[in-house]
Curated annotation (Swiss-Prot):
UniProt-recorded name of the protein: Myosin-4
GO cellular component labels: cytoplasm; myofibril; myosin filament; myosin II complex
Keyword Lipoprotein listed: no
Gene: MYH4
Domain IQ as annotated: residue spans: 785-814
Binding site for ATP: G179, E180, S181, G182, A183, G184, K185, T186
Annotated Myosin motor domain residues: 86-782
Residues recorded with modification Phosphotyrosine: Y389, Y424, Y1464, Y1492
Modified residues (Phosphoserine): 79, 392, 1092, 1096, 1162, 1237, 1243, 1261, 1278, 1288, 1292, 1303, 1306, 1413, 1474, 1495, 1514, 1542, 1554, 1574, 1600, 1603, 1714, 1726, 1739
Length: 1939
């Protein structure tokens, strides 16, 4: 194994591919008990790890990992492998090979996310259900060129091995990726393609250059991009897989001789086109539909005229519409880019999207049935217009072709009417065909793009086909998919087990054949062999009258009980019906054969196909061109539809042909298998279900593959190749210089190598190796080569160094020589003679040098010329060479293509020969059958002639019967009451039938072909046999049959009375009779030939029997009609019952709503008006339905009487036949011998005929039963009618009661309104006081604790206060002076604040009114709220008004009730609309309710404040009681309080009574409010938070103000004058409290939390009473001390009263202003939100307007373009006119016409058309003149006329187009005007809202500023009050001290 350093090349994928070194070392060192460590069988986990505890007598006791101890048999335990084999990469290397070892190895590797594992010769992969980093580019690079044993298991390793085998073995390879659906086949296929596309170009200097204008990406990019495109159109979500391939594909990647990527092609199989129109609930259609609707490319939505909601399209919304693991938006981008990379033109790309959109629109096309016809007609044309537009078709032609297709009858075409269901089936078939042909065409285009014409030598095929599928509903598609997997599994088994072992025997290796039990031939033969499932299916498709039932019967007859793989499924509850089961290798699958014949024949509407062929969309016309399916062009085996022509090739036949071609391709390659496994059914990463994985391992033959890999010799190599490759291991073993056989050489070579010699065997042509040995030899070879190369490198390096050393020595010697010469030269350089030599030497050679230079120049010029010539020749030769090479390549490609074509032609020839043989055999069969039919036909013709003679005689009798029947019908019409007497008449008829039974038996024996009348025939035969008493044996037989018939008759009579209600059994028996009829028809044909020897009298009886049979058939037809009518009546009755129950429930709901009339609105009044009209219409419809039911009952009675009359007619015929037969009795005696021989045959058919007779009688009884049931239905309807009248009266009474209740409520409402107004006023006053006190609280909060301590000290010092009171007089006077000054200043400030607050209040009120007017404009019914938004009871008044209106309408409710019952369905729609309006109005009511809740919150706050005030008042009274002088005044206060208490108690009692009276009404209102509240809560959450925050702030302010007020009161308690003021305050507080309580009780009645508030009020009253009791206790103390402080208190009280009044006024104004500010802020916020909403609407409308304007501009541009085109036409016309000088006038007219078109579009059509016509007339007249004058110009004039006509047509087209554009422009202009008007209105509203908002904001800021100033002034006043309070305490202290 590789070390961690070596695994580093895999990057972050290393831990997901192989165990680390640390883990391997730990596994090797882990203790292991080989004897006791075992796997044991477990019921839940299949196998669990255990430890052996003991072994006894074949039993083993083990302890599992879970700690449980079990005892099992010896054969139920399996030894565990040592720890070093944990997570082993190749399971073939394990010591103990068995199921648990394989299972746990896979499980442990899966837990470590090692999803790939070798299993002998193939690879097993487990779906991880998550992304793992094992496919990164560095992983691809790491696997390139690695041997299998050198790298961890991976799909890249399999791919690289296949690539290397292709290069070394020169053999085509294939990779078969198989497994069940959802196992990960598609992902692994993509990785294989990714690997080949990467390695095949890695290392190249440049990539393949794309052909200009054809490709937009390189070849490898296109190969990779083909996958997302095919996945988008061919993959879908299934139950088991979110990205399941719904088609199979075989991708061949072609390589050149050097391994370079050359080209690729794709073959597809079995596209599941039914998914286009139908999906199961947990599945969805193909990804492309949802990608388009993801809105990632909005231009597609606009182009395809679709929406982004899949539920708007029926074809794609039957299951799920989203997949969590798939991002449809990103996938759309990938798909779109793949289309571009693959070189699709823009038109082709648009066509793909348009056809996909057209398929979606097909699913929305609606059709309905014409009245009184079964013919279908379109139900709206909007969808059809869209679909036709996308397909460039005419919408009317498309609808006409769908509803009235033309079919060929003989040599003529006739128009055929279609039913609604037939039209829907046709639309679905067309949608599926378009999608399938488009998909196959895309594959063809992809193949064309991937075919680069480069030389290719080998290919690697990758097979990815749909996995084995077992659904709840399995159809023909599942059978084809499962059959394909069966064939692939058989191929795997055959390759792994059979071929492997056969090759051993062929090579002469000693081998004992092992049967692994993996043969799947039985199932395959059951499906594909002659008389198999496909064969029977194709045979049934040849017969026009074949049905699914006949197909099922043939399957049962041929295979049920004869083949173990064919079973009859057991019916399962909750699952779809199954007709047969097949035992596949992966499990038993139940198949439903519904619709198989149509799917196999794949019929299409030929008329619509003809439209497709003429479509303006080239792609669509190409798909349906020439009646050939697109798959014929795709070049690959594809599923496709049927092929037109004589062969009538079905879907199953084409599928088998393609499958056989695929198997042939696979057999010609060297396969590599990859087995994909599903770990669990829940798609949970890391979880593995043992039983599921074991099942797949067993089915896939994984264990058997490992065993044969271990036992067999999976590696083999030819002797010559082995000798050539491995000779290097021991070259001395093979002698040099002499010939030696390759086999002997291989034997010597292997014998001389140090290996295990039992691991290989020698065959005749190959040497075979066990697994792993060849890898060992490769390693030895690599080591040997490394040694040899090392030695070679050493020798080479030594040689090179010796050469280099020699050169170095030579250079050394040269250097020495040069140095010697230089030294010598330096010595003689200055010698005079040497100088002279230097001067003379050049002169001696200068002349020779000049000559040489001249010669050299000449030679240079010549050489230059020759070089130029040679260069030119070289270039010419190079060009020729390039051309020749190109021709050579072209010829090679041509030869290769011709060879491929020849091979394909040979294959087709073979197939045609096979087909010819099959067809010849079929022709022989058909010919023989035709001859038999001709013989039978001849016989029947002769019989027919005889029967026609007899028919003439019988017609007279029939006429008489018809006259009788007419009389009976007249009597029946006259007396309908005879229906009740039918039982008596039937009894009489039964007696008549009993008399004629014998005659029926005679006819029955004579004619077996008369199914329903054979009973009478047998009776006749029995009568004849009784007459022949001389023949004893025959008489005994006939008497026995007579007795049986009598018993049968008695049984039939009893059964007739018992089976009156068995309608379902009768229907089943009718089906059986029809089946028996078909069988009897065939038998009767044979019997007719046997009866040919009977005399002419029997033939007469046959004629009579034929007439009777016709009558019986007519009766059966009438019975069926009666049954259909009864079923229709039942359906109508059920519908009426349903409507009645729905209306009853609706009435109950309405009655409940009427009881809750308090919440009714004006919208409900309008809804009631509508319902009144609908109710009247419903009453009329009900009466019409009643009349119709009565008429239907009368019709049924009439038809029943007709059937009875016809039976009487048959009886009369039988009587006449009886008379005739009695006359011929003597003649028939001679024929009894012949008849006796036929008795046995007749008796066999007797049972079937008896059953037929019983069926007829049952049908007769059923008719009676149905008639009685119809009468009972009429009675029930009458009872219902009476009951409805009763209910109507009851409702009238209830309405009267409601009216009285409403009037009472109205009176109560007025009282409540007054009370609520009073409450509102009081609340405002208290709110003002709270806000004023809030400011004081802020400044006094820090003194609160101190004041409380001082208060306690003051209570302790009460006695001292009395002594110090006298001393404080002087200080009190001083304090009074300061206090007066402060009070005056504070009064002025408060007056100023009051003015500002009044101004702010007025502005706030104006703002509220503006906002209310905005709100009221939303609905007409809210107009009354414009000036009353501030009033909290506005909505209650409006509801009461609506209630009063409803009371008035209630009086006419009886009429409304009847009308509602007839118009229930329409009423539901209106009800929903009215409910929406009611919810809108309830929203407004809820807003008012929120305001109420706010007021209640304020009320609760006030109550708490009042409680605190009362507590503090009690404290004050305790302090005041120290005065003790005013006890009498306090007693008066007590009396007054008692009086107020009694008044409050009375008010509370009155409130409780009125509360109980109104409680029911409020509860009902609360229910409606609660319903509305849930919808509005989320909208007002933000506002509620703001309001709550403001409430909390106000509460804190109020509390602080209250504490401040308490401190003020305590500071003034020292003065006796404060006492009376405090008493006055107390009285005022009590009065306000009483008013507040009464108002709270009244408000509680209208709100949800009324009772709670009432309890709070009661508690408040109790607190007041307790406060009064406290006051009583303090009276004595107050009286004793009051006299001392009276004088001072009076003076202080006067000043304090004045200040207090000013303070209260200012506080009320301040509080009122704060409340107004808050309301203003809230209204302003809502107004801003409204403004934002309006701005958003305006922006949206502006966007829409811009789009519309843009469309108008486009239309104008089109019009201009049309004008331009018209101008061009005129110019062309002018050119034509120039050919003759006489056409100049026409030219001017046309030019003038074109100019007019340019200036006025409206007049373009008329001017161009009229001008064109006039010019044509003039031109034709002029041409006739010119023909006589100028013969030479005749040809040109004719051409001019032709051109003029052409231009005339184009001008007409342009004028028509111009007119259409003009209309569009006008329509768009109108729409633009309307939208502009709306925009202007919105703008005005927005501007008004903005102005109002700005005004309100300014007012708000101003008021806020004033409020801040008032607060500052209040703070100053409070500080002064605090100073006075301190001084008051000092005075108080002094007074106490003095006392």
């Amino acid at each position: 194994m590789s070390s961690d350093a070596e695994m580093a090349v895999f990057g972050e994928a290393a831990p997901y591919l192989r165990k680390s070194e640390k883990e391997r070392i730990e596994a090797q060192n882990r203790p292991f008990d080989a004897k006791n460590s075992v796997f044991v069988v477990d019921a839940k986990e299949s196998y669990v790890k255990s430890t052996v505890q003991s072994r006894e007598a074949g039993k083993v006791t083990v302890k599992t990992e879970a700690g449980t101890t079990v005892t099992v048999k010896e054969d139920q335990i399996f030894s565990m492998n040592p720890p070093k084999y944990d997570k082993i990469e190749d399971m073939a290397m394990m010591t103990h090979l068995h199921e648990p070892a394989v299972l746990y190895n896979l499980k442990e590797r899966y837990a470590a996310w090692m999803i790939y594992t070798y299993s002998g010769l193939f690879c097993v992969t487990v779906n991880p259900y998550k992304w793992l980093p094992v496919y990164n580019p560095e992983v691809v690079t790491a696997y390139r060129g690695k041997k299998r044993q050198e790298a961890p298991p991976h799909i890249f390793s399999i791919s690289d091995n296949a690539y290397q085998f292709m290069l070394t073995d020169r053999e085509n390879q294939s990779i078969l990726i198989t497994g069940e659906s959802g196992a990960g086949k598609t992902v692994n296929t993509k990785r294989v393609i990714q690997y080949f596309a990467t390695i095949a170009i890695t290392g190249e200097k440049k990539k393949e250059e794309s052909t200009p204008g054809k490709m937009q990406g390189t070849l490898e990019d296109q190969i990779i991009s083909a996958n997302p495109l095919l996945e988008a159109f061919g993959n879908a979500k299934t139950v088991r897989n979110d990205n399941s391939s719904r088609f199979g594909k075989f991708i061949r990647i072609h390589f050149g001789a050097t391994g370079k990527l050359a080209s690729a092609d794709i073959e597809t199989y079995l596209l599941e086109k039914s998914r286009v129109t139908f999906q199961l609930k947990a599945e969805r259609s193909y990804h492309i539909f949802y990608q388009i609707m993801s809105n990632k490319k909005p231009e597609l939505i606009e182009m395809l005229l679709i929406t982004t909601n899949p539920y708007d399209f029926a074809f794609v919304s039957q299951g799920e519409i989203t997949v969590p693991s798939i991002d449809d938006q990103e996938e759309l981008i990938a798909t779109d880019s793949a289309v571009d990379i693959l070189g699709f033109s823009p038109d082709e790309k648009a066509a793909i999207y348009k056809l996909t959109g057209a398929v979606m629109h097909y699913g929305n096309m609606k059709f309905k049935q014409k009245q009184r016809e079964e013919q279908a007609e379109p139900d709206g044309t909007e969808v059809a217009d869209k679909a036709a537009y996308l397909q460039s078709l005419n919408s009317a032609d498309l609808l006409k072709a769908l509803c009235y297709p033309r079919v060929k009858v003989g040599n003529e075409y006739v128009t055929k009417g279609q039913t609604v269901q037939q039209v829907y089936n046709s639309v679905g078939a067309l949608a599926k065909s378009i999608y399938e042909k488009m998909f196959l065409w895309m594959v063809t285009r992809i193949n064309q793009q991937l075919d680069t014409k480069q030389p290719r030598q080998y290919f690697i095929g990758v097979l990815d086909i749909a996995g084995f599928e077992i659904f709840d509903f399995n159809s023909l598609e599942q059978l084809c998919i499962n059959f394909t997997n069966e064939k692939l599994q058989q191929f795997f088994n055959h390759h792994m087990f059979v071929l492997e072992q056969e090759e051993y025997k062929k090579e002469g290796i000693e081998w004992e054949f092992i049967d692994f039990g993996m043969d799947l031939a039985a199932c395959i033969e059951l499906i594909e062999k002659p008389m198999g499932i496909f064969s029977i299916l194709e045979e049934e498709c040849m017969f026009p009258k074949a049905t699914d039932t006949s197909f099922k019967n043939k399957l049962y007859e041929q295979h049920l009980g004869k083949s173990n793989n064919f079973q009859k499924p057991k019916p399962a509850k909750g699952k779809a019906e199954a007709h047969f089961s097949l035992v596949h290798y992966a499990g038993t699958v139940d198949y439903n054969i519904a619709g198989w014949l149509d799917k196999n024949k794949d019929p299409l509407n030929e008329t619509v196909v003809g439209l497709y062929q003429k479509s303006g969309m080239k792609t669509l016309a190409l798909l349906f061109a020439g009646g050939q399916s697109a798959e014929a062009e795709s070049g690959g085996g594809k599923k496709g539809g049927k092929k037109k022509g004589s062969s009538f090739q079905t879907v199953s036949a084409l599928f088998r042909e393609n499958l056989n071609k695929l198997m042939t391709n696979l057999r010609s390659t060297h396969p590599h298998f990859v087995r994909c496994l599903i770990p669990n059914e829940t798609k949970t990463p890391g979880a593995m279900e043992h039983e599921l994985v074991l099942h797949q391992l067993r089915c896939n033959g994984v264990l058997e593959g490992i065993r044969i890999c271990r036992k067999g010799f999976p590696s083999r190599i030819l002797y010559a190749d082995f000798k050539q490759r491995y000779k290097v291991l021991n070259a001395s073993a093979i002698p040099e210089g002499q010939f030696i056989d390759s086999k002997k050489a291989s034997e010597k070579l292997l014998g001389s190598i140090d290996i295990d010699h039992t691991q290989y065997k020698f065959g005749h042509t190959k040497v075979f190796f066990k697994a792993g040995l060849l890898g060992t030899l490769e390693e030895m070879r690599d080591e040997k080569l490394a040694q040899l190369i090392t030695r070679t490198q050493a020798v080479c390096r030594g040689y090179l160094m010796r050469v280099e050393f020699k050169k170095m020595m030579e250079r050394r010697e040269s250097i020495f020589c040069i140095q010697y010469n230089v030294r010598a030269f330096m010595n003689v350089k200055h010698w005079p003679w040497m100088k002279l030599y230097f001067k003379i030497k050049p002169l001696l050679k200068s002349a020779e040098t000049e000559k040489e230079m001249a010669n050299m120049k000449e030679e240079f010029e010549k050489t230059k010329e020759e070089l130029a010539k040679s260069e030119a020749k070289r270039k010419e030769l190079e060009e020729k060479m390039v051309a020749l090479m190109q021709e050579k390549n072209d010829l090679q490609l041509q030869v290769q293509s011709e060879a491929d074509g020849l091979a394909d032609a040979e294959e087709r020839c073979d197939q045609l020969i096979k087909t010819k043989i099959q067809l010849e055999a079929k022709i022989k069969e058909v010919t023989e059958r035709a001859e038999d039919e001709e013989e039978i036909n001849a016989e029947l013709t002769a019989k027919k002639r005889k029967l026609e003679d007899e028919c003439s005689e019988l017609k007279k009798d029939i006429d008489d019967l018809e006259l009788t029947l007419a009389k009976v019908e007249k009597e029946k019409h006259a007396t309908e009451n005879k229906v009740k007497n039918l039982t008596e008449e039937m009894a009489g008829l039964d007696e008549t039938i009993a008399k004629l039974t014998k005659e029926k038996k005679a006819l029955q024996e004579a004619h077996q072909q008369t199914l329903d009348d054979l009973q009478a025939e047998e009776d006749k035969v029995n009568t004849l046999t009784k007459a022949k008493t001389k023949l004893e044996q025959q008489v005994d037989d006939l008497e026995g049959s007579l007795e049986q018939e009598k018993k049968l008759r008695m049984d039939l009579e009893r059964a007739k009375r018992k089976l009156e209600g068995d309608l379902k059994l009768a229907q089943e028996s009718t089906m059986d009779v029809e089946n028996d009829k078909q069988q009897l028809d065939e038998k009767l044909k044979k019997k007719e030939f046997e009866m040919s020897n009977l005399q002419s009298k029997i033939e007469d009886e046959q004629a009579l029997a034929m007439q009777l049979q016709k009558k019986i058939k007519e009766l059966q037809a009438r019975i069926e009609e009666l049954e259909e009518e009864i079923e229709a009546e039942r359906a109508s009755r059920a519908k009426a019952e349903k409507q009645r129950s729905d209306l009853s429930r609706e009435l109950e709901e309405i009655s409940e709503r009427l009881e809750e009339a308090g919440g009714a609105t004006s919208a409900q009044i309008e809804m009631n008006k509508k319902r009144e009209a609908e109710f009247q219409k419903m009453r009329r419809d009900l009466e019409e339905a009643t009349l119709q039911h009565e008429a239907t009952a009368a019709t049924l009675r009439k038809k029943h009487a007709d059937s009875v009359a016809e039976l009487g007619e048959q009886i009369d015929n039988l009587q006449r036949v009886k008379q005739k037969l009695e006359k011929e009795k003597s003649e028939l005696k001679m024929e009894i011998d012949d008849l006796a021989s036929n008795m046995e045959t007749v008796s066999k058919a007797k049972g079937n005929l008896e059953k037929t007779c019983r069926t007829l009688e049952d049908q007769l009884s059923e008719v009676k039963t149905k008639e009685e049931e119809q009468q009972r239905l009429i009675n029930e309807l009458s009872a219902q009618k009476a009951r409805l009248h009763t209910e109507s009266g009851e409702f009238s009474r209830q309405l009267d009661e409601k009216e009285a209740l409403v009037s009472q409520l109205s009176r109560g409402k007025q009282a409540f309104t007054q009370q609520i107004e009073e409450l509102k006023r009081q609340l405002e006053e208290e709110s003002k006081a709270k806000n004023a006190l809030a400011h004081a609280l802020q400044s006094a909060r820090h003194d609160c604790d101190l004041l409380r301590e001082q208060y306690e000290e003051e209570q302790e010092a009460k006695a001292e206060l009395q002594r110090s009171m006298s001393k404080a007089n002087s200080e009190v006077a001083q304090w009074r002076t300061k206090y007066e000054t402060d009070a005056i200043q504070r009064t002025e400030e408060l007056e100023e604040a009051k003015k500002k607050l009044a101004q702010r209040l007025q502005e706030a009120e104006e703002h509220v009114e503006a906002v209310n007017s905005k709100c009221s404009s939303l609905e007409k019914t809210k107009q009354r709220l414009q000036s009353e938004v501030e009033d909290l009871m506005i909505d209650v008044e409006r509801s009461n008004a609506a209630c009063a209106a409803l009371d008035k309408k209630q009086r006419n409710f009886d009429k409304v009730l009847a009308e509602w019952k007839q118009k229930y369905e329409e009423t539901q729609a209106e009800l929903e609309a009215s409910q929406k309006e009611a919810r809108a109005l309830s929203t407004e009511l809820f807003k008012v309710k929120n305001a109420y809740e706010e007021s209640l919150d304020h009320l609760e706050t006030l109550k708490r404040e009042n409680k605190n005030l009362q507590q503090e008042i009690s404290d004050l009274t305790e302090q005041i009681a120290e005065g003790g002088k005013h006890i009498h005044e306090l007693e008066k206060v007590k009396k007054q309080i008692d009086q107020e208490k009694s008044e409050l108690q009375a008010a509370l009692e009155e409130a409780e009574g009125s509360l109980e009276h109104e409680e029911g009404k409020i509860l009902r209102i609360q229910l409606e409010l609660n319903q509305v509240k849930s919808e509005i809560d989320r909208k007002i959450a933000e506002k509620d938070e703001e309001i709550d925050q403001l409430k909390r702030n106000h509460l804190r302010v109020v509390e602080s103000m209250q504490s401040t007020l308490d401190a003020e009161i305590r500071s003034r308690n020292d003065a006796l004058r404060i006492k009376k003021k405090m008493e006055g305050d107390l009285n005022e507080m009590e009065i306000q409290l009483n008013h507040a309580n009464r108002q709270a009780a009244e408000a509680i009645r209208n709100l949800r939390n009324t009772q709670g508030i009432l309890k709070d009020t009661q508690l408040h009253l109790d607190d007041a009473i307790r406060g009064q009791d406290d006051l009583k206790e303090q009276l004595a103390m107050v009286e004793r001390r009051a006299n001392l402080m009276q004088a001072e208190t009076e003076e202080l009280r006067a000043l304090l009263e004045q200040t207090e009044r000013s303070r209260k006024v200012a506080e009320q104004e301040l509080l009122d202003a704060s409340e107004r500010v808050q309301l203003l802020h809230t209204q302003n916020t809502s107004l801003i939100n409204t403004k934002k909403k309006l701005e958003t609407d305006i922006s949206q409308i502006q966007g829409e307007m811009e789009d519309i304007v843009q469309e108008a501009r486009n239309a104008e541009e089109k019009a201009k373009k049309a004008i331009t085109d018209a101008a061009m036409m005129a110019e062309e016309l002018k050119k034509e006119q120039d050919t003759s000088a006489h056409l100049e006038r026409m030219k001017k007219n046309l030019e003038q016409t074109v100019k007019d078109l340019q200036h006025r579009l409206d007049e373009a059509e008329q001017l161009a058309l009229k001008g064109g016509k006039k010019q044509i007339q003039k031109l034709e007249a002029r041409v006739r003149e010119l023909e006589n004058e100028v013969e030479n110009e005749q040809k040109r004039n004719v051409e001019a006329v032709k051109g003029l006509r052409k231009h005339e047509r184009r001008v007409k087209e342009l004028t028509y187009q111009t007119e259409e554009d003009r209309k569009n422009v006008l329509r768009l202009q109108d729409l633009v005007d309307k939208l502009q008007t709306k925009v202007k209105a919105y703008k005005r509203q927005a501007e008004e809202a903005e102005e109002q908002s700005n005004v309100n904001l300014a007012k708000f800021r101003k008021i806020q500023h004033e409020l801040e100033e008032a607060e500052e002034r209040a703070d100053i006043a409070e500080s002064q009050v605090n100073k006075l309070r301190v001084k008051s305490r000092e005075v108080h202290t002094k007074v106490i001290t003095e006392e």
